[in-house]
């Protein structure tokens, strides 16, 4: 079987890797001559089965394929529409997954934890469940999930849906139940406004059963006869933060809708542990540390509002993600004793310092470029409360693992 992959962002590269690992012949293309292919290059792939084209799309090769995977960012473009009209879209060819009871979890923050909670509850209730989704959120991409779901028998499929891929996922998957954790200020370069983002969510949940956050004023406005509300979980939970009580209650309400008993839900959540890269609390020598990805202002605020941290260590976003610089506006108000900046997704530390200077930030500010130097700095601190977060999940996870070891 010959499959084409159109677009080689994170999802496209993940799709290429997933297909090659399964022995498919793959043609992958992207019109951007300067596309970063580091994800593809670090994998041990069979290059003999990969026909890679950078700078253009060969439509003849694409339309002669047995199936075509399209990057979510291209889903509303003409090339995707043409592929769908020709009956070549991969989810229309490999479509067994559409018969599985499917739960989609979306929102600005809490998607990964809530998805894992639902998965954990269902698995511990005796069901066969497949979990996956958004390649930028710690999973191996939508295509990996689709392929897995078509290979074996499952009772349920749980998908983490990125807020920028709602239309794409609505087409690729036959979704039965949607959980929306919250609507916050992230990816505003795509959504343009919180009002427009809310409208996109409203369209996504249309005619479907949806579980919405009663603490989110934008989501409360979307209530209808098909919606259920969640609040804060009041059972035992071994996770840091009030925000995780909301995630747990979202999972509880979703699983009750699926027919899982309260007893099984409570029992499962008692044994649930933090997902790698998400917020965790630990003791390091005499210091109390909370660490986890908080790549937008709402996520950061949710953690920092829990308690006062003397030292805040945050990773920087990509060069083009200036919409995430508003994290610094909140940090100025929060005013930690010491702020450490490190290169998270890109080395935009200089841009962060310049932005803080414009804000008139006068507290102790340092730039530390290397993970080992961050560890060494933490070792000099005594009896401090430290938060490590911001952008750059892989580096945050690495720092956390070194502190635990």
Where are the predicted features?
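Phosphate-binding loop of NTP-binding sites
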Residues: 18, 22, 61-63, 72, ...
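Residue-level detector of alpha-helix initiation sites
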Residues: 10, 109-113, 245
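Short, basic phosphate-binding NTP loop
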Residues: 2-104, 372-377
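Short, hydrophobic beta-strand segments that form beta-sheet elements in well-ordered domains
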Residues: 5, 25-30, 52-53, 67-70, ...
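Adenine nucleotide phosphate-binding catalytic loops in nucleotide-utilizing enzymes
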Residues: 6-8, 28, 192-195, 210, ...
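Short glycine-rich anion-binding loops that position phosphate/pyrophosphate groups of nucleotides
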Residues: 73-75, 163-165, 184-186, 216-217, ...
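Active-site regions of enzymes building and remodeling cell-envelope glycoconjugates
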Residues: 41-54, 80-89, 100, 175-177, ...
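ATP-dependent carboxylate-amine ligase
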Residues: 1-35, 62, 68, 260, ...
